[in-house]
């Protein structure tokens, strides 16, 4: 049997066309045969420089035969074997969409071991300028999400000896741009509350949202078993998702901290208690036509848009109702740690970072109070 050649071992030769060619061992097949990486150059000196860089790059590499598969083939495997079993269906659908529309059309046919950081960087620039196969430039946030998917997939490729290094480690990501939040001020919030009074079907839904700041899926997924009228609490145990192609599925809360018990304001306890007396469904907010099913998250979003327009209020995302609740809670004196628990944030620091526009105002107000106190103290002294 031929001796197994170690990785990094190589050879140099001059080809018939006059160019110099070199190769190094970068792995082995199942039968023990070597897997080579080839480089070529016009001169022997140039070749040796290239070869030296390759030896450094592939130092300690032990690639398998699968290193010859394309990036597209690997993405299919990673999505099926790694992503699908470990993430929520909605997240998995998003991953598949990014792969099919933004990665595979441009880099999918390239051998995975030959995908470079330059290839990935070019892809990201193209997506920002022109978009994927659907057309339309993609936002920095979307490109960063696509990067997250590709980065995860290629990390596993490194672990499985398909590539030596993750090429996405060496790319520059578009600058993160935080989307502007639309917060209803006191007068606007009053108008919104007046608007929902005219909608018997949706009033309770939006009242609960404004007084708890629940995520849309959490709100739609509430059941009567989650409500304790005596204690005045609401337990958030699940979240509802729209299923692609129609229907819904019930999943876990977004994070571990998302599973929480919220102390409700007395007015909200009274509202839910009265609602429960006439309810015929296990869901707090059932589908009006099929009460055995919950109301769909998209329905709440659509109705909110109409209510805002009818009330002459600024257009906003459903999530901005959550921001509105949080902003008014902070300005009313609720401390950040308590608010973090109500919102289901994993860390209080995230709450503080998210609502810096509020905490900044609170700090300025506090400094003014301290300043007045110190001025009085100095004068009295």
Which positions does each model-derived feature cover?
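Basic, Lys/Arg- and aromatic-enriched nucleic-acid-binding interface segment
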Residues: 136-140, 144-146, 159-165, 169-223, ...
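C-terminal catalytic core of tyrosine-transesterase DNA break-rejoin enzymes
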Residues: 159, 207, 211-218, 299, ...
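Short functional hotspots where side chains directly engage DNA or cofactors
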Residues: 169-170, 231-236, 317, 328, ...
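C-terminal secondary-structure termini that scaffold catalytic or DNA-interacting sites
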Residues: 1-3, 194, 231, 244-270, ...
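N-terminal DNA-binding recognition helix of tyrosine site-specific recombinases/integrases
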Residues: 7, 11, 98-102, 109-122, ...
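Active-site/catalytic core of tyrosine-dependent DNA strand-transfer enzymes
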Residues: 28, 186-187, 239-242, 265-314
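Catalytic-site neighborhood detector that most strongly recognizes the C-terminal catalytic loop/helix
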Residues: 42, 175, 183, 240-242, ...
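N-terminal DNA-binding module of tyrosine recombinases/phage integrases
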Residues: 15-122, 275-284
């Amino acid at each position: 049997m031929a001796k197994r050649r170690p990785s990094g071992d190589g050879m140099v030769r001059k080809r018939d066309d006059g160019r110099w060619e070199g190769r190094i061992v970068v792995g082995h097949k199942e039968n023990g045969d070597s897997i080579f990486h080839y480089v070529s150059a016009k001169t022997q000196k140039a070749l040796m420089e290239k070869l030296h860089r390759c030896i450094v790059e592939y130092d300690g590499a032990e690639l398998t035969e699968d290193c010859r598969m394309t990036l597209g083939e690997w993405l299919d495997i990673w999505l099926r074997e790694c992503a699908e079993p470990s993430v929520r269906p909605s997240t998995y659908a998003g991953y598949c969409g990014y792969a099919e529309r933004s990665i595979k059309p441009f880099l999918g046919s390239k051998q995975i071991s030959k995908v470079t950081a330059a290839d990935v960087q070019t892809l990201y620039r193209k997506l920002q300028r022109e978009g994927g196969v659907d057309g339309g430039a993609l936002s920095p946030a979307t490109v960063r999400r696509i990067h997250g998917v590709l980065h995860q997939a290629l990390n596993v490729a490194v672990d499985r000896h398909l590539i030596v290094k993750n090429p996405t480690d060496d790319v520059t990501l578009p600058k993160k741009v935080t989307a502007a939040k639309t917060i209803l001020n006191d007068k606007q919030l009053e108008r919104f509350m007046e608007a929902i009074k005219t909608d018997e079907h949706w009033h309770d839904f939006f009242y609960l949202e404004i007084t708890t700041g629940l995520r849309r899926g959490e709100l739609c997924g509430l059941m009567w078993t989650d409500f304790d009228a005596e204690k005045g609490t609401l337990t958030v145990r699940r979240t509802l998702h729209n299923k692609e192609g129609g229907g819904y599925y019930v999943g876990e809360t977004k994070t571990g901290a998302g599973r929480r018990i919220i102390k409700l304001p007395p007015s909200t306890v009274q509202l839910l208690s009265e609602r429960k007396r006439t309810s015929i469904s296990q869901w707090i907010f059932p589908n009006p036509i099929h009460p055995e099913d919950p109301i769909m998250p998209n329905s709440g979003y659509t109705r909110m848009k109409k209510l805002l327009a009818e009330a002459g209020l600024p257009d906003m995302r459903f999530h901005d109702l959550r921001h509105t609740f949080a902003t008014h809670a902070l300005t009313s004196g609720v401390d950040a740690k308590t608010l973090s628990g109500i919102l289901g944030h994993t860390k209080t620091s995230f709450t503080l970072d998210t609502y810096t526009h509020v905490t900044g105002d609170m700090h300025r107000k506090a400094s003014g109070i301290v300043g007045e106190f110190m001025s009085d103290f100095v004068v009295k002294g």
